[in-house]
Curated annotation (Swiss-Prot):
Region (Disordered): 708-729
Molecular function as annotated in GO: 3-hydroxybutyryl-CoA epimerase activity; delta(3)-delta(2)-enoyl-CoA isomerase activity; enoyl-CoA hydratase activity; long-chain-3-hydroxyacyl-CoA dehydrogenase activity; NAD+ binding
Listed name of the protein: Fatty acid oxidation complex subunit alpha
Phylogenetic placement of the source organism: Bacteria, Pseudomonadati, Pseudomonadota, Gammaproteobacteria, Enterobacterales
PROSITE patterns on file: 3HCDH, ENOYL_COA_HYDRATASE
Subunit description: Heterotetramer of two alpha chains (FadB) and two beta chains (FadA).
InterPro entries xrefs: 3-OHacyl-CoA_DH_CS, 3-OHacyl-CoA_DH_NAD-bd, 3HC_DH_C, 6-PGluconate_DH-like_C_sf, ClpP/crotonase-like_dom_sf, Enoyl-CoA_hyd/isom_CS, Enoyl-CoA_hydra/iso, FA_oxidation_alpha_subunit
Gene expressing this chain: fadB
Signal sequence, renumbered to the chain: none
HAMAP family the record matches: FadB (MF_01621)
Amino acid sequence: MLYKGDTLYLDWLEDGIAELVFDAPGSVNKLDTATVASLGEAIGVLEQQSDLKGLLLRSNKAAFIVGADITEFLSLFLVPEEQLSQWLHFANSVFNRLEDLPVPTIAAVNGYALGGGCECVLATDYRLATPDLRIGLPETKLGIMPGFGGSVRMPRMLGADSALEIIAAGKDVGADQALKIGLVDGVVKAEKLVEGAMAILRQAINGDLDWKAKRQPKLEPLKLSKIEAAMSFTIAKGMVAQTAGKHYPAPITAVKTIEAAARFGREEALNLENKSFVPLAHTNEARALVGIFLNDQYVKGKAKKLTKDVETPKQAAVLGAGIMGGGIAYQSAWKGVPVVMKDINDKSLTLGMTEAAKLLNKQLERGKIDGLKLAGVISTIHPTLDYAGFDRVDVVVEAVVENPKVKKAVLAETEQKVRPDTVLASNTSTIPISELANALERPENFCGMHFFNPVHRMPLVEIIRGEKSSDETIAKVVAWASKMGKTPIVVNDCPGFFVNRVLFPYFAGFSQLLRDGADFRKIDKVMEKQFGWPMGPAYLLDVVGIDTAHHAQAVMAAGFPQRMQKDYRDAIDALFNANRFGQKNGLGFWRYKEDSKGKPKKEEDVVVDDLLAKVSQPKRDFSEEEIIARMMIPMVNEVVRCLEEGIIATPAEADMALVYGLGFPPFHGGAFRWLDTLGSAKYLDMAQQYQHLGPLYEVPEGLRNKARHNEPYYPPVEPARPVGDLKTA
């Protein structure tokens, strides 16, 4: 043994060839600060070996290196800029020394090589991969950019276009694509990986492969003519501006850095990468996006822990076909859980099957599946007008009309047709689960399972625990949701549960702004362009359906009369009474016509201004700041109340539900992350300016207490140790 660290070791293989093996104590390898330091020590040992002829890098895990240790990021991002810059210089000196070894090097890459893992193998001369490879640089999705030389080496290896596509989008590629663009030099079966890598290494040692020529381009300026450079970087900047926008500075910073570094060799190019990385790491956007990643891991870990002792449902059923039922059936079948889809109407069954077939055909068109796979999936969806096969299902989700009487009748009837241990769930969006449970003989086997539309795209499923829902019931539906590829978040029961309960105060803020003379077009523009929502409130209401919102608004008002009962006719009432239901009938805040792709395209409709004039004061202008405050305060206050009342368990789960269920702008990180960034004291000062608008603007007492001491909702993070300590961590 030449060297043994906590996460890697170095040993001789044969005849002057050494192997450096990443083998962390846990289930995966991460390129954390300790591993970077250990890698530097191992390379120091190699540099002393006069008889060294070649080096093989490999992993003892199912994945090579999954990336940097993101749990360290928030503390690293608090380190002063100068210290963070020094540590990056140290880390890059390690990879430079690996790249500068006087012998050929190869990485045998299996599974994931992401972020720092990818940057590590870019420093070797050759890369051989297994078919399950996923390799790439996802850093821009975390609000930063590659910091271990990825933005320097990848463009010089692949050319600017391929590298920009990966780096700016934060994407990863599979083995075939990696081979095609030159990111790896070959792909072999897993059992042949080390053998194949050794064969390449021997060829390089013997002079059959010119490893020095392979290495040289990574040390030099990027080989691009002025015209090629202008085309590549202009196109890349245009694409980034279109897709990322101003709220996500990392992608455009990465592109500009690669452009600026193109005319320099490795050392100066790395300095430019360092100078760009450090300011990004100190942005609110980076902290928010890293926070989302960590919250996502927390939520998924919680679901995994919850389901460790239950069997995932093997057969499911959906009550009520149509678009929603068809979407749920498709998602279940697509992920391998056969499903019975029941409706009392043959026309609805046809609609549900058509929806599933449409989604599968899209996968076929994109080349994700072949005809055989399509036929196989669709054959596991069984449409029926009766209860045939219900005696074999493990879980049933009801997705009929949003009417408590109808839902109770359907659930009670279904309970008599299934096994005593079958779990029933309702896809209701607002009706309390404990109320629906009153119709059942086995309420302990019942809970809520709130999917979001469109089901195949929206990652969140709210799992609602009723007063009598058993732990096993909750665990079974969480297991099914996870199997479907969704992110399940368990909430406690109340009208609207969590997501809709906090959404309708937001809509109330919108209605009050309109009542006071604001223009809905400006509100939408501000909330989309300035705050960052994917849709403004008017457009969102048109997509949700004005009739749906009108009904849900009444349910929420009955559930929370002190805050959500209004004493005036609002814009939703006005449009509903005019039979303007949004996209579903082509008339809402806008008029809708199908474009060439069959998608609804919004157009101005002057009739709307006349309708709204009847329920609002004369038009007046509001500042962007006032619009944002009046829209967000009711939502944030209600989010805080949900935490204080135990409807949602943690700030992390609340923020993920908002991001995954409502499209809360990820660069804000969710309501609690936004609150922490703003500061609870500053938020209280802002909210107090609008308390005259009513109970929705009154700040909850718990938040007032935090504001007195300016306390955050997320646990404070301590800065990482000084750079000198980090080097030897």
